[in-house]
Amino acid sequence: MPLASVEHQRVHLVQRRPGTVEHSKAIEHLVSFEELSSLEIEDRITDAFCALGTTIAKAGSVEQLQRVDRDYVQDFGRVTKKLGAERLSVVSAIGADPKSINYFNRTKGEMEALLAELDLPSLRIFRPSLLLGAREERRPKEVVAGVVLGALSPLLAGPLRRYRGVEAAQVARAMYATSLEDFSAVRIFESDEIQGY
């Protein structure tokens, strides 16, 4: 969406491997996330968006999942602050809590707390429920969960509405739309609020 916007003159894509986006505004930066702190961008950065995350199956261990979902995201936050970004929007997860007994929710909660400690001008945290949509890799458990949640969605009303699955594109729309709004400090968007975009 920033590629199509008049608000963004250039879009810097920070990636580990070459992407498929071809656009006159897009500038690709291939960087190892181990060396993220060395990233230099000469343009003035207004908005930074981070949707970095993995699964335990892909990571291979809780420690590796934490490295990606917490540590690399914190590193990205540090870099965006160093580059002078006005706003950082990051994807977390429903139930994120640094005190959770669930390793995934605890990792996401720790990531949120570490980003908040960076004292960024504006931090927007998006906590979607199960992310729906096409993936590069097969995730059988998520496919099953998506089918079940899809069938149950009409029943998930009121406070349960936040547990409805959310299309990844809808999260992206919410991140972009809120980047055009003025929020200072830390603002958390829960899954049911994301569904309104």
Model-predicted regions and their roles:
Residues 1-3, 79, 114:
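Rossmann-fold NAD(P)-dependent oxidoreductase module
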Residues 2-4, 25-29, 43-44, 63-66, ...:
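Short, glycine/charged-enriched secondary-structure capping and boundary segments
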Residues 6-9, 98-197:
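Oxidoreductase cofactor-interface core, primarily capturing Rossmann-like NAD(P)-dependent enzymes
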Residues 13-20:
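Short, polar loop motifs at secondary-structure junctions
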Residues 14, 51-52, 88-94, 126-128:
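SDR active-site strand-loop-helix element
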Residues 19, 55-56, 94-97, 131-132:
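Short, catalytically relevant binding-site loops at active-site mouths
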Residues 20, 25-75, 79-82:
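NAD(P)H-binding glycine-rich loop region in Rossmannoid oxidoreductase-like domains
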Residues 59-63, 67-109, 117, 121-124:
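Conserved Rossmann-fold NAD(P)-dependent oxidoreductase catalytic core, especially the SDR/UDP-sugar
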